[in-house]
C-alpha cells in the first residue's frame, strides 16, 4: 500500500514522501496513529493544503524534544539488579526497565523511544540512545550494579568484574616455600 507520510519516520522517509509499505503496517500502525494518509489524489490535495500546519506542529514538537534533550543529555541512571560474581545479571535490563527508570527521574518517556539492540545482561556502564523525536536523539548512561555502593565505584571507573574486585586484593598466591617443604618431605620418605 502506498501512503503519504505526515511526519518523519525512521527507515521510511521524510514528511510528505509517498512510500510503499506493507498493508498491515499501514492499517495497524501508520494510519491509526495519524502518521500517514493513503496515497490517493484527494489525500494528496488535503496534505498539500495542510502542509504548512503540519510542518509547524512538527517544528513545535521538535523544539519541545530538544528542550528535554538538553536536560537529559549526558545524564546517568542507576539500575540495581542481582548478578553473579563475574558480573552476569540474573535476568536482563530491557528497554522497558530503562524507560521506567528515566520516567521515575522526572522525564516522560515510552519504552519504544529507547533504542537498544539487545537487552543488557552484564553489570557496568552502558551508553543507551533515546529517540525523543525523529530528529532529536540523545545518549544517556545506564549504570547497572548489584548495589548503589557498587554503582558509585563503577561511576569512578572501577571495574567490578575483574579478579581483584571479585576476590579482593588481599588474596595472595601461595608462596613457593610451601611447595618446597612438600617436595623435601616427599624426598625424605
Swiss-Prot record:
Highest taxon in the source lineage: Bacteria
GO (cellular component) term, any one: ribonucleoprotein complex
Keyword set includes rRNA-binding: yes
Protein name: Large ribosomal subunit protein bL9
Sorted UniProt keywords: Ribonucleoprotein, Ribosomal protein, RNA-binding, rRNA-binding
Gene field: rplI
InterPro entries in alphabetical order: Ribosomal_bL9, Ribosomal_bL9/RNase_H1_N, Ribosomal_bL9_bac/chp, Ribosomal_bL9_C, Ribosomal_bL9_C_sf, Ribosomal_bL9_N, Ribosomal_bL9_N_sf
Claim: RNA-binding is one of the keywords in the record: yes
Transmembrane segments: none
Summary of the function given for this chain in its UniProt record: Binds to the 23S rRNA.
Assigned protein family: Belongs to the bacterial ribosomal protein bL9 family.
Single GO MF annotation: structural constituent of ribosome
Gene3D superfamilies: Ribosomal protein L9, C-terminal domain (3.10.430.100), Ribosomal protein L9, N-terminal domain (3.40.5.10)
Pfam families attached to this UniProt entry: Ribosomal_L9_C, Ribosomal_L9_N
SUPFAM superfamilies referenced in this protein's UniProt entry, alphabetically: L9 N-domain-like (SSF55658), Ribosomal protein L9 C-domain (SSF55653)
Listed HAMAP family: Ribosomal_bL9 (MF_00503)
Protein's GO biological process: translation
